[in-house]
Amino acid sequence: MPIGIPKVAYRIPGEAVSTYVDVYNRLYRERILFLGEDLDDEVANQLIGVMVFLNSEDDTKGIFFYINSPGGSMNAGLGVYDMIQHVNVDVTTICMGLAASMASFILAGGTPGQRLMFPHARVMLHQPMGGNGGKAKYMVEESVEVKRLRELIAHLYVKRTGQSLEKIRKDMNRDNFMRPRQAKEYGLIDHMVTNVNELDELDKQSNDLKKLGKVNLTNIETSNKSELK
């Protein structure tokens, strides 16, 4: 018998009394997202909507995106991937369990240096799925578009991993499972983590690098102004 989604107490900023919301809504407020099912348009739109909201609410705090999914449609995956690139904040992607097909693509699309896996997680690379069939004429047209999208995804894997296009194409032709060490060597992830404290430390390092970048930029601007005087 299913237990349903648990409710947890949450006090909305500015309110005196806490209210009970489902645990996922509570986590969203903490800037934590989950992809824990097949990726379709509905799931993708929910994730995209939350990312847009969190980015507009505060563009200085990062988002943690946990992934345990067998993948799904290419269009849905590309939508989530593009939104990760679009938002101003860092998006830390974390694989727990399995990130397969388009889910591995989203994992690789996280902020460089912040693409993570737990020790016993796996990623799986293969050809992402296309459409569902129909009349012959439309199936031919769709087949051409599916091939185009697969080629686009292969090129994006090249960009995110540093592997050659030929190797990516070859590895996508079959189910290609990787453990954390293999995924890191391949370029799909940056680190393996074992506990939440490591996530906090990586987040702190990222913020420190951003501050350093701002300081360096300020110094450059000040130097340029001095030279112009």
From Swiss-Prot:
CDD domains assigned to the protein according to its UniProt record, in alphabetical order: S14_ClpP_2
EC number annotated for this UniProt entry: 3.4.21.92
Domain of life: Eukaryota
GO molecular function: ATP-dependent peptidase activity; ATPase binding; serine-type endopeptidase activity
Record's keyword annotation contains Chloroplast: yes
Record field: transmembrane: none
Annotated compartments: Plastid, Chloroplast stroma
Active-site residues, as the UniProt record annotates them: S101, H126
Top EC class, one word: hydrolase
GO cellular component: chloroplast stroma; endopeptidase Clp complex
Reactions mediated catalytically: Hydrolysis of proteins to small peptides in the presence of ATP and magnesium. alpha-casein is the usual test substrate. In the absence of ATP, only oligopeptides shorter than five residues are hydrolyzed (such as succinyl-Leu-Tyr-|-NHMec, and Leu-Tyr-Leu-|-Tyr-Trp, in which cleavage of the -Tyr-|-Leu- and -Tyr-|-Trp bonds also occurs)
Keywords: Chloroplast, Hydrolase, Plastid, Protease, Serine protease
GO annotation terms (biological process): protein quality control for misfolded or incompletely synthesized proteins
Subunit: Component of the chloroplastic Clp protease core complex.
Function: Cleaves peptides in various proteins in a process that requires ATP hydrolysis. Has a chymotrypsin-like activity. Plays a major role in the degradation of misfolded proteins.
Family of this protein: Belongs to the peptidase S14 family.
Name this protein carries in UniProt: ATP-dependent Clp protease proteolytic subunit
Organism: Mesostigma viride (Green alga)
Classification of source organism: Eukaryota, Viridiplantae, Streptophyta, Mesostigmatophyceae, Mesostigmatales
Gene from which this protein is expressed: clpP
